[in-house]
């Protein structure tokens, strides 16, 4: 039986990591790291290759700006010296142009 795709939300402040930077990363994608919230980290651990996520610009803009695909399951986040948190690798599927009211 084929795996059921799960859908997620990944958020970043656009001055830290933006949709335009994600586009420039190309098909190799990027490591989504730096998550230091335990609930969010637990969700990262549940993500599987092929799952999709909305890319949300938080704080500035506050809008969904794209869709990314998980291309590598969770692994230890190299930016976490204590090795408690994880990261995933993602690549852009589509940039969204949603009208804001």
Task: List the predicted regions and their residue ranges.
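A broadly conserved detector of short glycine/acidic/proline-rich loop/turn motifs that flank catalytic sites
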Residues: 14, 59, 94-96
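Aromatic- and Lys/Arg-enriched surface recognition patch
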Residues: 67-101
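Short, charged beta-turn/beta-strand-edge "cap" motif at the junction between a beta-strand
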Residues: 56-62
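Compositionally biased, charged N-terminal/linker segments
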Residues: 1-48
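Short acidic/glycine-rich loop or secondary-structure boundary segments that cap or lie
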Residues: 18-20, 62-66, 77-78
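Short, conserved beta-strand edge motifs with alternating hydrophobic and charged residues
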Residues: 9-11, 55-56, 67
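A short, structural micro-pattern
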Residues: 4, 62, 82-86
């Amino acid at each position: 039986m084929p795996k059921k795709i799960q859908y997620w939300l990944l958020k970043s402040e656009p001055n830290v990591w933006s949709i335009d930077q994600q586009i420039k990363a190309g098909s190799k994608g990027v490591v989504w790291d730096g998550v230091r919230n335990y609930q969010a980290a637990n969700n990262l651990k549940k993500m599987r290759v092929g799952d999709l996520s909305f890319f949300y610009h938080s704080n500035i803009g506050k809008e969904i700006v794209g869709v990314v695909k998980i291309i590598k399951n969770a692994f230890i986040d190299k930016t976490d010296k204590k090795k408690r948190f994880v990261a995933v690798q993602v690549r852009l599927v589509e940039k969204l142009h949603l009208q804001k009211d």
